Amino acid sequence: MKYKNIFLTGSTGILGKPLLKKLVNEGHSVFALSRNKLNNDFLISNNAKIISGDLFNDDIYEQLKEKSIEAIFHVAGENKKCQKDPSGMFKTNIEGTKQMLELGNKLNIEKFIYTSSAATLGEKKGSIGDEDSTHRGTFLSDYEESKYLAEEVAFAFKKEFEFVSINPSSVQGPGRMSGTAKLMISTLNKKFPPLIKSSVSVVDIDDCTEGHYL
């Protein structure tokens, strides 16, 4: 990757942590968004430059405008299943993504890399779906719908800068204890009965990190 100065969101999540380390180890200057000061020790120890705030803070631009940011990795997102009120997740995943896209436009970046989900892609019976597969038009979860709609917003910015959407399946690795990881662990520990002919697509965190960097 040719870009020197990079802004990274979601830098302390399961994917953000190894991606931050990868970027720094490859010689990039990483400006990491931090909404919680408790995470700052991790960021500082990994040579990231801290940008304080969350996806909706207007002063992020002021903190970055003199940093010559060339690319944004927008990894931050919310993934919670079976919420009674998913409006917070929709705000984070859709409006938060739009905020970062508009930030990239103001910063005159060259490239925006967005962490989406395989759930936004269509299926192909008997084969693996890809970006050319037509989505079924219905959603299995609020999370899937929020990521699909976020992509729709993001693609509108393709004329402003190079836009890349990364669509991993269920990311698994050290430290992952919730979501599908919790389900698989419970099944292995015989605390949850396995479903006949059920399956889930998974991707190793290291492979996912490399895919983002490429």
List where the protein language model places each region.
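N-terminal Rossmann NAD(P)H-binding glycine-rich loop of SDR-like oxidoreductase domains
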Residues: 4-26
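Glycine-rich NAD(P)-binding loop of the Rossmann-fold in SDR/ketoreductase-type enzymes
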Residues: 88-99, 145-146, 203
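NAD(P)H-binding glycine-rich loop region in Rossmannoid oxidoreductase-like domains
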Residues: 42, 48-95, 103
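Conserved Rossmann-fold NAD(P)-dependent oxidoreductase catalytic core, especially the SDR/UDP-sugar
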Residues: 95-143
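Conserved catalytic-site region of short-chain dehydrogenase/reductase
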Residues: 81, 118-128, 142, 171-177, ...
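Glycine/proline-rich active-site loop of Rossmann-fold NAD(P)-dependent oxidoreductases
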Residues: 160-161, 172-183, 214
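A conserved pocket-lining segment of Rossmann-fold NAD(P)-dependent short-chain dehydrogenase/reductase
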Residues: 185-203, 207, 211
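Conserved beta-loop-beta element that borders a ligand/cofactor-binding pocket
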Residues: 152-174
